[in-house]
């Protein structure tokens, strides 16, 4: 039995709003300038605000706290409605980019018989919609994934591996790019293999007689697993399978395989599909398993930009491949996901940092002595140490996320152009750029998704018991986030892969003087032969006096760490023996990338920050981030003699502790600078007005309504009554009342 509140809602004992309002009034930070910095440019900031405004005011796309109470099937139904809603925005967004608002049918144009008239959709065409999807994913990650699997994985797999004709057919004529006609999934992972793509077991056997491929699942472990959209939604799959021609295995290639009839959604012959069931989070995604039993597809359904099965008039068959790009092209679809996860890290980090900081400012606990007001959480030094470095994380992620995204799109454009070029030099150049992009995206994806997983849980704990409530977002936020640490590349495997490439670059530079001054000059500038020599000789000293030192210290540490690893590998002849250290290389490389990109941007005109007080606050964020992670990794910094124990305790830690109260003074200005409306936060303890307790209580009551008279017993009420009924006999003997005899016993 429950009963409505009888407390006057206007009575106020604790008033967290006054603290938020005071902090906001006292802040000297220019919020508009900082937000422009965080959104990369004034134009992007304007677009972000316009799209957020549309999203939070769309009755279908917006989310409220009832989102946290939804069950699996409810989530999937709601997600399906939202997918349909997003699809309706897509054509509008493309026309906006093209400035093409005349009364024409974009789908009809894309399907035109004459390829010259059917203008292909480019990355630029999808710029606004991609931005919209990224922002939607911040309030509803499962929706972002559902659409992202179709456009980002299925679509980019076709773009990265298909011929121009195949791209046009699947993405334009069949309507995939506009989410019309067909809906795709990405069938790479198997029950028995995930990260080791080269050992996937699904087979695509070429049938020479019928000029077709036969797709087959040879055993249980080859079952496609975790396939988003497969269980109920996808009509087609981009399937990773072993190409077998005349008995020879050519390795894993990509094929488009129909799964369902798009008009009836009936499974096609030979295709078996099931739902993989309950997951830790993102239940709005219908992840499924797929098995193929002799499924026949035309030869043309093999994506053939870099590997072709060619049938000659005389009946002979040859396999032609472009070795420069064939191997890495197979992973190109995953690049978009990894790049987007770095951007997601900025968006998610800013969301949860905002909630936790506002709560820490408004919440009071314990008075220093009797008669004084209770202290705000944010004024406790330990709380500052727990919260403020986490606030710095999304600040440092933002510049590198936008830079990585821009690099990704420009490199992909070069890839498409190079694969159509007769000039081998173009292929060589874009191949090197892709490899560097793989290193950076792998390192940054792994490191940042780990950082945000830590951020969400640590900040949840700083909000105490209220952080544990689903209505404040941390629980579902964490469950939805941590899949990022294992999908589209397990973080440890990605870290090892990127670090091995960095180690090779280091050895080539240190021992052979090899360094590409064109392609490696940015992310890998610390690997220049001259710089390595200066660090090894001791000419370059570590210190924390100038702003640039907070980045360079990571360059010095990386070189000493890589040199140490090189020595160990030379002795053991086993790269696996240094795996733990290689993961550190990847993390340190990512942290250096983040610091360097932030430093370069804040030092440039492109920072868009003209106010000196604001810029000083931004530099404090930069220094606090670097110092926090130096302190976290102080063991390594001492091991490689970057700092002595005395320097850690007398230089690094005092600087770190001194910065906390300085950044604390700006914390509301820094969180306001993310410019996230309440509807994007969806957490009543973090809303802009700071009315923590009323906002939270009202949302709890709205989602758990109570009858005025307290009527309505739970279904298990009889069980509780029966359990307690075991004591009724004694109660009845005493007349069922608290008589004088009982009270006298209690009071003895």
From Swiss-Prot:
GO terms for molecular function: acyl-CoA oxidase activity; FAD binding; fatty acid binding; flavin adenine dinucleotide binding. Pathway: Lipid metabolism; peroxisomal fatty acid beta-oxidation. The keyword Oxidoreductase applies. GO terms for cellular component: peroxisomal matrix; peroxisome. Transmembrane segments: none annotated. It is found in: Peroxisome. It catalyses: a 2,3-saturated acyl-CoA + O2 = a (2E)-enoyl-CoA + H2O2. Homooctamer. InterPro entries: ACO (IPR034171), ACOX_C_alpha1 (IPR055060), Acyl-CoA_ox_N (IPR029320), Acyl-CoA_Oxase/DH_mid-dom (IPR006091), Acyl-CoA_Oxase/DH_mid-dom_sf (IPR046373), Acyl-CoA_oxidase (IPR012258), Acyl-CoA_oxidase_C (IPR002655), AcylCo_DH-like_C (IPR036250). The keyword Cell membrane does not apply. This is Acyl-coenzyme A oxidase. SUPFAM superfamilies: Acyl-CoA dehydrogenase C-terminal domain-like, Acyl-CoA dehydrogenase NM domain-like. GO terms for biological process: fatty acid beta-oxidation; fatty acid beta-oxidation using acyl-CoA oxidase. Gene3D superfamilies: Acyl-CoA dehydrogenase/oxidase, N-terminal domain, Butyryl-CoA Dehydrogenase, subunit A, domain 2, Butyryl-CoA Dehydrogenase, subunit A, domain 3. Belongs to the acyl-CoA oxidase family. Its cofactor is FAD. It is an enzyme of class 1 (oxidoreductase). Its EC number is 1.3.3.6. It comes from the Eukaryota. Keywords: FAD, Fatty acid metabolism, Flavoprotein, Lipid metabolism, Oxidoreductase, Peroxisome.
